[in-house]
């Protein structure tokens, strides 16, 4: 006779075991109609699952984030249902939920095309419109294996074979003639699926292993309503216009090519942006007391084994063998910084010691995940490592957070979200060390009144971390900065200092990156500003154009004045109409377009126009220089 406690504290008693659907019906018909799943304690379950004991119960609808995630997961099953009707020989692999939607990996001889997606989506719409019921059956593992063997679903069988020995049953979901396997929960019927769209195709591999079977991945998005879907698609259309790959090509910033997958060829203009950011960060490093260092590109396997990276990260490392020794190209900079710290015994009076490096890192990311300069194999990280005593941790974390916010503000990101990621299953170090590390980060955030959300299990293998996520002009979120507390690696690599009592102690190591990788951050900036970079970041800050050849000497002299003032100015002496030049440099997103004719030459002035088409009139050269210098020095997002 279970007693159910509802979110408002009210209780309901039942004479026998009861399902989530029956509980919803006992509360009201409208809730029963809207119900998608049920939360029992902390666990989400299907409405058809029975509850035999006393429990805290919440009915989940599409108004809950969990409900929307369930809708998206069920859309993946709907995709499988429709696809097997259209291409019966295809083999279904996995279909998880991702941000805003879902995907399904498929093995098939047929090569899917964008035209196929339209056909597949239409079949999904027809199936969803019937509102058919989804049936769940708990099935013995052996029987589930037989079912998928009969259906020639080889990958489902492999998944079953990977189950732990104590797993006796598996949840099978029946979508009419289609069967899928999942932990669930899922919607009780297709009437709950109201708005979805298939979006793109890509390649993938079984378990992400490039040596395993090649698969095809179909992506989709799903929302609560058609309006939410339409809003999302409108946003995506705007994001498409801002695609950093397209803008990077149009503005001659960089390129990528097959001979160097995941590695960027920086052109002069793109490299100007890169170096401007690097130089800006150096000013912050000096302000906050960092020593800039540089470590080797490759290190012996033995060091990576000591640090724990070989065991936890080995599959993503590029390796080589030299003189019968295994080496790895560094995927991160921290072990190298410990080696620098270890040169000469340190005193507590020297702490904290703050190292920074624009470290070139390489990670063997799967080819299917590479994306422009946002996801690459060779990148530079604005890495920093602070070695300090335990009683200095809180102050250093607070200083680092101030530095992070200062940097983001200068780049125009005002909306920053924080998350505290705690210990993962695979980790190094004792629980006591993790307790202290997690507590240290949380107290530092609370001391600064910084709001954050907890992300259990998402920390690095060597310590918990604070993650800084930027929200851009389209409302998209980009996780960039991290601050990670590490009590483990310094001990593993023999880092020590002498305390005030003359005893050897192991320092605490704080890992921090603000921009993340410079490549990815530049990609974010390009999309944030749609290529219209703030003046201080613009590769060319002013383009000076003579109306005729008779004004060429004048503009050349003017350009030298701009350059002497530290402004990146160029001149366009081509024999083209001035209107043509203005249009071309407007498309190149040059902030200031400066024109010189007879009037300007005689009065030692320039006619000023901005890239957004605003005419600022005729201005004296000194005034223009002063204005542009002010915009550069203040890191202004404006150009007027």
UniProtKB/Swiss-Prot annotation:
Catalytic activity: tRNA(Thr) + L-threonine + ATP = L-threonyl-tRNA(Thr) + AMP + diphosphate + H(+)
Binding-site list for Zn(2+): 334, 385, 511
Keywords associated with the record: Aminoacyl-tRNA synthetase, ATP-binding, Cytoplasm, Ligase, Metal-binding, Nucleotide-binding, Protein biosynthesis, RNA-binding, tRNA-binding, Zinc
GO molecular function, one term: threonine-tRNA ligase activity
GO cellular component annotations of the record: cytosol
Record bears the keyword Lyase: no
Location in or out of the cell: Cytoplasm
Sequence ranges assigned to domain TGS in this UniProt record: 1-61
GO biological process assignments: threonyl-tRNA aminoacylation
EC number(s) from the headed UniProt entry: 6.1.1.3
Superkingdom per UniProt: Bacteria
Cofactor binding description: Binds 1 zinc ion per subunit.
Subunit architecture: Homodimer.
Cited NCBIfam families: thrS
Family note: Belongs to the class-II aminoacyl-tRNA synthetase family.
Task performed by this protein: Catalyzes the attachment of threonine to tRNA(Thr) in a two-step reaction: L-threonine is first activated by ATP to form Thr-AMP and then transferred to the acceptor end of tRNA(Thr). Also edits incorrectly charged L-seryl-tRNA(Thr).
Name this polypeptide is given: Threonine--tRNA ligase
Organism: Dichelobacter nodosus (strain VCS1703A)
Gene encoding the protein: thrS
């Amino acid at each position: 006779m279970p007693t159910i406690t509802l979110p408002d504290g009210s209780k309901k008693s039942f004479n026998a075991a009861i399902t989530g659907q029956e509980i919803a019906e006992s509360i009201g018909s409208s809730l029963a109609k809207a119900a998608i799943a049920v939360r029992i304690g902390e666990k989400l379950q299907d409405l058809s699952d029975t509850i035999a004991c006393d429990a805290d119960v919440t009915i989940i609808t599409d108004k809950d984030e969990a409900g929307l995630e369930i809708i998206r997961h069920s859309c993946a099953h709907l995709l499988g249902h429709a696809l097997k009707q259209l291409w019966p020989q295809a083999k279904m692999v996995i279909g998880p939920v991702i941000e805003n939607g879902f995907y399904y990996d498929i093995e098939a001889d047929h090569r899917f095309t964008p035209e196929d997606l339209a056909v597949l989506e239409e079949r999904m719409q027809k199936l969803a419109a019937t509102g058919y019921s989804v049936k769940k059956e708990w099935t013995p593992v052996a029987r589930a294996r037989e079912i998928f063997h009969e259906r020639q679903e080889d990958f489902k069988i492999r998944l079953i074979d990977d189950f732990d020995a104590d797993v006796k049953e598996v949840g099978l979901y029946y979508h009419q003639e289609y069967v899928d396997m999942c932990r669930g929960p899922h919607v009780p019927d297709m009437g709950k699926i109201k708005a979805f769209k298939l979006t793109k195709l890509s390649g993938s591999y079984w378990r992400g292993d490039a040596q395993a079977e090649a698969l095809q991945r179909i992506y989709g998005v799903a929302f609560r309503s058609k309006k939410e879907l339409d809003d999302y698609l409108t946003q995506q259309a705007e994001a498409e216009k801002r695609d950093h790959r397209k803008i990077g090509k149009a503005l001659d910033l960089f390129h990528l090519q097959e001979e160097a997958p995941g590695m960027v060829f920086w052109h002069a203009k793109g490299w100007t942006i890169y170096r401007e950011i690097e130089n800006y960060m150096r000013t912050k490093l000096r302000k906050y007391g960092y020593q800039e260092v540089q470590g080797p590109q490759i290190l012996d396997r033995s060091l990576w084994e000591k640090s724990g990276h070989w065991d936890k990260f080995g599959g993503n490392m590029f390796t080589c063998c030299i003189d019968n020794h295994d080496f790895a190209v560094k995927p991160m900079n921290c072990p190298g910084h410990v080696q620098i710290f270890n040169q000469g015994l340190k005193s507590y009076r020297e702490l904290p010691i703050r190292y920074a490096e624009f470290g070139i890192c390489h990670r063997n990311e799967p080819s299917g995940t590479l994306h422009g300069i946002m996801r690459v194999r060779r990148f530079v990280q604005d890495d920093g490592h602070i070695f300090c005593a335990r009683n200095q941790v809180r102050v250093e974390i607070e200083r680092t957070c101030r530095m992070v916010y200062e940097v983001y503000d200068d780049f125009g990101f005002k909306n920053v979200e924080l998350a505290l990621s705690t210990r993962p299953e695979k980790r190094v170090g004792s629980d006591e060390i993790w307790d202290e590390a997690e507590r240290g980060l949380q107290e530092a955030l609370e001391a600064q009144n910084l709001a954050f959300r907890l992300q259990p299990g998402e920390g690095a293998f060597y310590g918990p971390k604070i993650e800084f996520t930027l929200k851009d002009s389209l409302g998209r979120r980009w996780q960039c900065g991290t601050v990670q507390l590490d009590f483990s690696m310094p001990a593993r690599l023999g880092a020590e200092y002498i305390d005030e009592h003359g005893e050897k102690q192991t320092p605490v190591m704080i890992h921090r990156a603000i921009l993340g990788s410079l490549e990815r951050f530049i990609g974010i900036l390009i999309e944030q500003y749609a290529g219209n970079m703030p003046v201080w970041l613009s590769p060319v800050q002013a383009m000076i154009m003579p109306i005729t050849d008779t004004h060429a000497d004048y503009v050349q002299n003017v350009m030298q004045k701009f350059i002497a003032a530290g402004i990146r100015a160029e001149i366009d002496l081509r024999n083209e109409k001035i209107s043509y030049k203005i249009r071309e440099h407007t498309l190149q997103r040059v902030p200031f377009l400066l024109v010189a004719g007879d009037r300007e030459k005689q009065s030692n002035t320039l006619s000023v126009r901005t890239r957004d088409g605003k005419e600022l009139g005729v201005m004296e050269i000194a005034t223009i220089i002063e204005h542009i210098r002010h915009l550069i020095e203040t890191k202004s997002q404006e150009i007027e």
